[in-house]
Amino acid sequence: MTKQTEYKRKPEWLKIKLNTNENYTGLKKMMRSKNLHTVCEEAKCPNIHECWAVRKTATFMILGAVCTRACRFCAVKTGLPTELDLQEPERVADSVVQMGLKHVVITAVARDDLKDGGAAVFAETVRAVRRKNPFTSIEVLPSDMGGVEENLKMLMDAKPDILNHNIETVRRLSDRVRARAKYDRSLEFLRRAKEMQPDIPTKSSIMVGLGETREDLIEAMDDLRANNVDILTLGQYLQPSKKHLPVLKYYPPAEFAELKEIALSKGFSHCEAGPLVRSSYHADEQVRSAKEKTAEAK
């Protein structure tokens, strides 16, 4: 057996129990009927069955289903995006009502074709959800919106409950993994978000298994903490197709536990770490934990 073949074989701890009960099928039908997209489907998230069938949660993906970037880890389609759908914010808000969500995550494809990076529609989606669901906490997961401060301000002025922006990988691998996004630009984005709205928790995520070292990961944690990021998620990279970057290492659960302890020792208010953890995984629990610790610190 070659080393490359060995890398492609998933270990036991990554095997997922599929659950397609009425919650799952009902949620899928609702998304289709409202012409909405979820990152759960578009990015081939391994937790879709747990979230849709058991937890009845979903991460809405706005601004279309075609991304202007072509990150080498991501399964979302790339190309020329469609025109903006200005009715999308209301449909998302109505879906949150229909689902009875206590916490909603709203993400988007990168829209480098737009001057504001999609910030106006993103902000309006937050406001629409807030109007119709005043007791639902709202987490936003935008791209870097070109690193333009005015675009970020537009989104932060809508007052989401949590701002999530992923650095995705360590500094040493960033240019290879996501060539059109920049590591330092993402850190700056997170720093500015905290400066604009100090009471809104910030969050970021790192994939592992792309060739990073323990030292690389610790450096990334330090970089995030230096920019006042509150919450960290760590999960296993899984290759979506043969066209994407290969998995170079499968981290066992015990190693994720070690990384979580390191992250918490760095001062993160919450760290979710595990083979199947993704940025939005158990997001409601993450934001609740962060807010409780912020309140305790005051």
UniProtKB/Swiss-Prot annotation:
Pathway: Protein modification; protein lipoylation via endogenous pathway; protein N(6)-(lipoyl)lysine from octanoyl-[acyl-carrier-protein]. Pfam families: LIAS_N (PF16881), Radical_SAM (PF04055). Residues 53-269 form the Radical SAM core domain. It is found in: Cytoplasm. CDD domains: Radical_SAM. Its cofactor is [4Fe-4S] cluster. GO terms for molecular function: 4 iron, 4 sulfur cluster binding; lipoate synthase activity; metal ion binding. Keywords: 4Fe-4S, Cytoplasm, Iron, Iron-sulfur, Metal-binding, S-adenosyl-L-methionine, Transferase. PROSITE patterns: RADICAL_SAM. It is an enzyme of class 2 (transferase). Its main location: cytoplasm. GO terms for cellular component: cytoplasm. Its EC number is 2.8.1.8. InterPro entries: Aldolase_TIM (IPR013785), Elp3/MiaA/NifB-like_rSAM (IPR006638), LIAS_N (IPR031691), Lipoyl_synth (IPR003698), rSAM (IPR007197). It catalyses: [[Fe-S] cluster scaffold protein carrying a second [4Fe-4S](2+) cluster] + N(6)-octanoyl-L-lysyl-[protein] + 2 oxidized [2Fe-2S]-[ferredoxin] + 2 S-adenosyl-L-methionine + 4 H(+) = [[Fe-S] cluster scaffold protein] + N(6)-[(R)-dihydrolipoyl]-L-lysyl-[protein] + 4 Fe(3+) + 2 hydrogen sulfide + 2 5'-deoxyadenosine + 2 L-methionine + 2 reduced [2Fe-2S]-[ferredoxin]. [4Fe-4S] cluster 1 binds at C40, C45, C51, S280. Binds 2 [4Fe-4S] clusters per subunit. One cluster is coordinated with 3 cysteines and an exchangeable S-adenosyl-L-methionine. Belongs to the radical SAM superfamily. Lipoyl synthase family. This is Lipoyl synthase. The lineage of its organism: Bacteria, Bacillati, Bacillota, Bacilli, Bacillales.
